[in-house]
Amino acid sequence: FYELDAINQARVMELEDSHAEKTKDKSLAGIIRTNSYPTLTAEGKGTLLYIFSRFNHSCTPTIMHKYNDLLNKRYVYASRDIAVGEELFSNYVDFYASTKTRREELQSKFGFKCQCTSCSATGSTSKVSDSNRSEIKRLDDVVYENIRTGNYEEANVSIEKRIDLLEKEDLATPDIMYRIAYDGYQCEDHRGNAAKAVDWLLKCRNYSRQFLMRETFDCLEIQKLLDERKPKISETNICNNKN
């Protein structure tokens, strides 16, 4: 901070300090604690980005973000179609948690009671949403365990359920769907169903291109898997035609 010029120091000090009772009590430490995000490779360290820190929170965000440690940049991507003039919302906490848990964490860490559309829902709507989000999280563990133990049919059923619930909660973001598509690929690949495995890989590639640069390791790895498996499908089709 002290190596910044006066203009950039002032920009940092304009940011919110959720740990100060009054604006005049803002501190540099409080601003950093409120606005910093952890990096992927440096434990206990984070980055403070002036523009990114301006995004408000929603438990049904319209944007997502990914940190590139090599470039020391945080990239922001749309998590769904966004209307002209619609506010861009990030997410500060685990959006699979219950409304009560999310609100308590946001109040404790950031000093505000969340009034987003998800948290403002009442009655049965709120209960259904909490149940859906809890089930989405549970199914993630179920899919992992079923793939690990070779129960691929059960894993596929859980994958489809998870996709359905994510869409209902408007949480089917490209990064989450990318992971789900990769789970689907693993199921079909282990079962020896080359055509369906490639279908899932194509979905992986499409989702990855919505939030990753094409030169990143994940994108290159998916393309490599596609290149390896497409010829096998052609060979299988030729054999089937001969039969």
Q: Which residues does each PLM region occupy?
A:
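Boundary/linker segments of alpha-helical solenoid repeat arrays
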Residues: 170-174, 206-222
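Alpha-helical linker/edge segments of TPR/alpha-solenoid repeat scaffolds
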Residues: 223-243
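Hydrophobic stripe of amphipathic alpha-helices that form coiled-coil interfaces
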Residues: 165, 195, 207, 214-215, ...
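Short, charged low-complexity intrinsically disordered segments located at boundaries
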Residues: 43, 192-195, 231-238
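Catalytic cores of histone-lysine modification enzymes
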Residues: 1-62, 109-118
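Eukaryote-specific, cytoplasm-facing alpha-helical/coiled-coil scaffolding segments in long proteins
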Residues: 76-78, 212-214, 230-232
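Inward-facing hydrophobic residues that define packing positions of alpha-helical scaffold repeats
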Residues: 159, 201-202, 208
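C-terminal SET catalytic tail plus cysteine-rich post-SET Zn-binding segment of SAM-dependent SET-domain
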Residues: 54-191, 196, 221
